[in-house]
Structure formats: structure tokens, C-alpha cells
Amino acid sequence: MQRRDDPAARLTRSSGRSCSKDPSGAHPSVRLTPSRPSPLPHRSRGGGGGPRGGARASPATQPPPLLPPSNPGPDATVVGSAPTPLLPPSATAAAKMEPENKYLPELMAEKDSLDPSFTHAMQLLSVEIEKIQKGESKKDDEENYLDLFSHKNMKLKERVLIPVKQYPKFNFVGKILGPQGNTIKRLQEETGAKISVLGKGSMRDKAKEEELRKGGDPKYAHLNMDLHVFIEVFGPPCEAYALMAHAMEEVKKFLVPDMMDDICQEQFLELSYLNGVPEPSRGRGVSVRGRGAAPPPPPVPRGRGVGPPRGALVRGTPVRGSITRGATVTRGVPPPPTVRGAPTPRARTAGIQRIPLPPTPAPETYEDYGYDDSYAEQSYEGYEGYYSQSQGESEYYDYGHGELQDSYEAYGQDDWNGTRPSLKAPPARPVKGAYREHPYGRY
């Protein structure tokens, strides 16, 4: 029985022998461009189910993977994709760990390839590489959105320029700080923000400020900026922006170059208190503050031969409404109100009788009227004509109906016509218990 060879296996054996005998020393997996296309694998006549046919067809269906040449020859032609650029090992590891972050290797490659004469470009690249290494890169896109739902605290910073160029002679720093820094402390407590004065000219010692500015310390980097007020707020977004607006509105009041406003006047008064200036005396009747107040009265001269000042109270002179010593006091009449500050009258003499206040009518006063005494009939004759004229009227008839004549005769004894013949001063009050001629005689 004649044995037939497979053409595919024959081609594989011939290519293996040619590769092994390649004088260029190329890798066995690298093959040169063939002179004619390789024929397709054919199945054996036995249906491909035999072990011999399957073993011979497997090398053609599954060829070994092609690898990039380590050191290809000059005449070798590689079939496949273009070779990838060579990268440093550290950059390759970073690219494998973070495939999305390709910005840092590119910056480092550009910095290495850049000429050192480009100083500004080298400085900018160094700053950018440092930011990326610290993890501060590409955060600007994330900060464009405010998260109001989570209520996370945020920090706001604003720099308010002080108009020293427009008003170079005005001391804005002293007005904002205040005496011993008390003004800016109260301003921070009122607004709830951190406020500080920074920039060129913010320090009192100019020599020290210049020394710190040239020192290059990042803490004093603000000395290279213009004079400004730095406002810093920390809190939830809504509250932080509200506090910032309030703080900026209050700081704006201190940027007015006016030495006579309320802020400067309060600072002058506070400075006088801190320096130990005594406060104006506070006595009775002496006004301390306020515009338009009357000046204090001059001192009263003392000594013999000097008269009292106008409107002054002299000891021993009667005051309006007061009782003079030795004057007659009428019983039943309340004394006039006394003047505040006037000396009280003394009632130790025998001519003045002390009367209790307010006067109460005593029951013994009715005993002086003498109801048992008889009165003269002179006054009844005067009323007789009036009674006869009004008797016909119903009004007076009803009042007089059923009464006796004796009730009118009892009042007829009173001499009304001769009681007050003229307007004269009433007589002095008689001694208690004496007989009166008339019950109303004292009037």
C-alpha cells in the first residue's frame, strides 16, 4: 500500500529547516516573506477522524503567538503593528497602576526634553508636576458644583483691596485695627468671620517688613501683594456666603477716609480711657455729656460783705409757701405744700400751735354753736315778703304743706342783715370754750 504525504506538513517541515539555517540570526518565530502563499490545510481521505490526520492539521490551525523582536536584523521585515515607544520603568508602572492618569508622564517627558534656557516654562512645569504629585490636580472641575444637600462645611476666602493709592495719607490700618486691636476683635465677633489686614504696609515696623519680604518665607508671602483685608469664612454653603456678605458690608464702613465719623470718635474715646484720662465728674445737677448742655455754675464767693448770688437761697429768708416763724396759723386750713429742699419751720414757740395733717373735724366743734339759745326775729321779716309771693306756686306749696309756723319762726331770730355789714378782716379766734355770738362769725 503506497503512503501519501500531506502537503501542509511538508510545508511546515521545510519552513522550520529554512528558519533554523537563517544566517542573520533572527528569532525562529520571525519568518521572512514567503515566495508563494501557503496552501490551505487538507483533510485526509479517511474523514479526518484518524489520529494521524488530526495531529498533522493542528500546527496549521493554531500557530504559535508572534512576539516583538528583541534584536531584529537589518534585513528582517516584521509583519504586524508598529512598535510602541520606549518609556522609563517608573512611568510604565504608573501607567499600569493608573491607566487614566497619563498627564504626569507627559509632563515629565516634556520637562526632560525641554532646553534649560526656557526658565519660565521649566518653572511652570515643575509647579504643575508638584501639584499632580500632591493630588491637587484637576480639582477645579469638581469645585464648580455646590453640594447643598449634604450640608458639608466649605471655606470661602476673599481679599478686599484697601484704597491706599487714592488716599495715601489716611491711616486705614489703624482705623481697622483700633486701639490695641479691639476694633477688629469686635468686628470678628460680630460678623463671625476671620478678618486680618495683609499686604505691603500692614506691619508697623517697615524695616522688619522688608526683611521678612526678602526672606522668602511662604508665611509672609502676602507682603508682596497690595494692602488688603483678608476675609475667611468657614461653614455650610448658604451660611458661609451670608457671613461673607455681612463681613464685607461691615468692612466697607472702615474704608471711608473720614476722621470725624462715629467709628473714629468711638476709637478716640476708647483711647482716652485706655490712656488713663479721668472721666468727667458726675454730681447732682451737673450734666456730663451731650451737646448744648448748660455750663456748670460758677463757684459761690464766701466771706463777709459779699451778697448772695442771684436766685440763691439765703438762710433765714422765708420761702414761698413756707410758714414764717411767729405767724398766726388758722385752725382748719391745711398748710401750703413745702418747697423741696427748703428748711422745715420750727414750732417750738408758744405763738404757733402744731396742727395735725390733714385736719379732721372734732366732735367738740359742734358744742360751740349753742342750739338752745334763742334768735332774734329780724331776719324773718326779710323773708316774709318772699314767702308770701312764692306761696301761690305749686313748687313751694308742696314743700310747705303740712309744716307748722313754728319751724320758720325758729330761723327768724337770726339777724342775717347785720351779720356782715362790711368786708373786714375776721376777728382773732377766741379761746376754746368761750361763747360765740354767731356760729359763722369766724368767716
From Swiss-Prot:
Residues 1-95, 280-317, 326-345, 411-443 are annotated as: Disordered. Residues 400-420 are annotated as: Interaction with ZBTB7A. GO terms for cellular component: cytoplasm; Grb2-Sos complex; membrane; nucleoplasm; nucleus; protein-containing complex. The modification N6-acetyllysine is found at K21, K175. One of its GO terms (biological process) is negative regulation of DNA-templated transcription. The modification Phosphotyrosine is found at Y387, Y435, Y440, Y443. The modification Phosphoserine is found at S18, S20, S29, S58, S113, S150, S390. Keywords: Acetylation, Cell cycle, Cytoplasm, Isopeptide bond, Membrane, Methylation, mRNA processing, Nucleus, Phosphoprotein, RNA-binding, SH3-binding, Transcription, Transcription regulation, Ubl conjugation. The modification Omega-N-methylarginine is found at R282, R284, R291, R310, R315, R320, R325, R331, R340. Residues 61-72 have a biased composition (Pro residues). It is found in: Nucleus; Cytoplasm; Membrane. There is a cross-link at K96, K102, K139, K175, K432 (Glycyl lysine isopeptide (Lys-Gly) (interchain with G-Cter in SUMO2)). Residues 434-443 have a biased composition (Basic and acidic residues). The modification Asymmetric dimethylarginine is found at R45, R52, R304, R331. Residues 100-260 are annotated as: Involved in homodimerization. Residues 171-197 form the KH domain. PANTHER family: KH DOMAIN-CONTAINING, RNA-BINDING, SIGNAL TRANSDUCTION-ASSOCIATED PROTEIN 1 (PTHR11208:SF30), RNA-BINDING PROTEIN RELATED (PTHR11208). The KH domain is required for binding to RNA. The Pro-rich domains are flanked by Arg/Gly-rich motifs which can be asymmetric dimethylated on arginine residues to give the DMA/Gly-rich regions. Selective methylation on these motifs can modulate protein-protein interactions. This is KH domain-containing, RNA-binding, signal transduction-associated protein 1. It comes from Rattus norvegicus. The lineage of its organism: Eukaryota, Metazoa, Chordata, Craniata, Vertebrata. The gene is Khdrbs1.
